[in-house]
A protein has these predicted regions:
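N-terminal pre-ligand scaffold of iron-sulfur
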Residues: 9-76, 90, 103-123
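Short cysteine clusters
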Residues: 62, 81-84
Length: 123
């Protein structure tokens, strides 16, 4: 299931995924795993995490020094930057501890046409 999404939403309706980036299938993103994709429009890296069956998509960029977050340890709902140990909440993007103080962007995730999709929805 997608975090924060009504599980009955969109049933029986063909959902438009234009402007969305294909991530993969549930079988390719099991609980405890993550995957990085590049937004089809902005080319920004997005990290998608499966935490106990819920999907979260965030900017794959530490706001402390610009390093990749993907590959850092996950503690509950927090990802730890592998470079300097800053932590970010995957549910909100909030910076949880120094050396980062600015949040990371959080992106929508949806399931449609048998796959997982995300997009950089920043203006």
């Amino acid at each position: 299931r997608v975090a924060g999404e009504d599980p009955g939403r969109g049933r029986g309706v063909s959902e438009d995924v234009s402007g969305w980036t294909y991530v993969g299938t549930r079988a390719e993103l099991l609980p405890g795993e993550f995957k990085v994709v590049y937004d089809e429009v902005t080319q920004e890296p997005i990290a998608i995490y499966n935490i106990d069956g819920d999907l979260y998509a965030v900017q794959d960029l530490c706001t402390h020094d610009g390093g990749d977050l993907a590959g850092g340890e996950v503690h509950g709902f927090e990802v730890e930057c592998p470079r300097h140990g800053a932590r970010f909440d995957l549910r909100t993007g909030e910076a949880m501890c120094p050396p980062a103080y600015e949040p990371i962007a959080k992106f929508p995730v949806r399931e449609a046409h048998g796959g997982i999709w995300t997009r950089d929805d920043r203006e």
